[in-house]
C-alpha cells in the first residue's frame, strides 16, 4: 500500500519509476500501479542469462506495453550465466596473490582489480563477448521493439564488462556491434 502511494506520488511529480533492482512481485506491483512509462535502467533478458536481476519475457513485454524502456546492463554476470563460475575459478587460481594483497589492508574489489590487471589476457578471456550482450539486445528488440531498448551499462557499479566494453570510451565498439 505504501509503495503504491509512493509510485502515485512519483507519477504526479514526473519521476520515472525504475524497475531494475526489484523482485518480481514488486515489479508487477509497480507495473500495475504506475500510470506512466517505467524504465529498467540496467537490466537484461533472463531467458538468455537466468539470474534474478534480469527480466523474464513477460516482464519485458509488460515494460513495452507500458511504453517504458529497458537499458542493457553490461555486468558480465548478467550477460553470461557462465561468467560467475569462470570468475570464481580465476580468483581461486590467484587466491594466494589476492590474499597477500588483502593482508596489506586494501579493499577486496581493488585487490581483484589489481590481479585482473596483472593477468589481463587471462581475465579478459573469461568475460563475455559484445556478441553475447547483443543477444540480449536482439531478444528484447524482438519482444518489444527498438524504441524500448537503451544503454544502461552500470559502469559506476560493476567490476567486469564484456570484452571491448571496459569504459564509455569503448562505446564505438557497441555501436559497431549494432550495425
Question: PLM features: what roles do these ranges have?
Answer:
Residues 72-74, 144-165:
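Short acidic/histidine-rich active-site segments
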Residues 139, 166-179:
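Mid-to-C-terminal alpha-helical segments outside catalytic/metal-binding sites
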Residues 1-18, 22-39, 52-68, 131-147:
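Histidine/acidic residue-rich metal-binding segments in metalloenzymes
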